[in-house]
């Protein structure tokens, strides 16, 4: 069964998340790694895990992934959304 994952992609400054711009996504995948693969296909970027966040190969952007929870993430607008129409 596939789960929903909440994904934030933002820029970095000095190796830390900067949040001067932000894109939010909801991804349906079997695992967190599957969500990373889906975002790699969509963005055309490769991601590496540093223990806290996923960094792009260039290091200029980072990605955070968490389980999607309607209570916390339901009010955001998303750049891409894999929820079914009945779940929105």
Listing of model-derived features with the role each one plays in the protein:
Residues 22-25, 40-44:
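Short intrinsically disordered coil segments
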Residues 10-12, 30-32, 57, 70:
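Generic structural motif
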Residues 19-32:
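A short, exposed loop/beta-hairpin motif centered on an aromatic-Gly-Thr core
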Residues 35-39:
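Short amphipathic, charge-patterned alpha-helical segments
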Residues 42-88:
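Short, mixed-charge low-complexity intrinsically disordered segments
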Residues 1-22:
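Short aromatic-glycine-(Arg/Gly/Cys) micro-motifs in beta-strand/loop hairpins
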């Amino acid at each position: 069964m596939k789960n929903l994952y909440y994904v934030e992609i933002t820029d970095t400054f000095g190796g830390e998340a900067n949040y001067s711009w932000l894109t939010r996504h909801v991804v349906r995948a079997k695992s967190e790694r599957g969500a990373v693969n889906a975002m790699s296909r969509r963005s055309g970027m490769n991601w590496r895990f540093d223990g806290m966040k996923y960094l792009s190969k260039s290091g200029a952007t980072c990605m955070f992934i968490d389980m999607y929870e309607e209570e916390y993430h339901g009010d955001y607008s998303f750049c891409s959304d894999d929820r079914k129409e009945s779940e929105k």
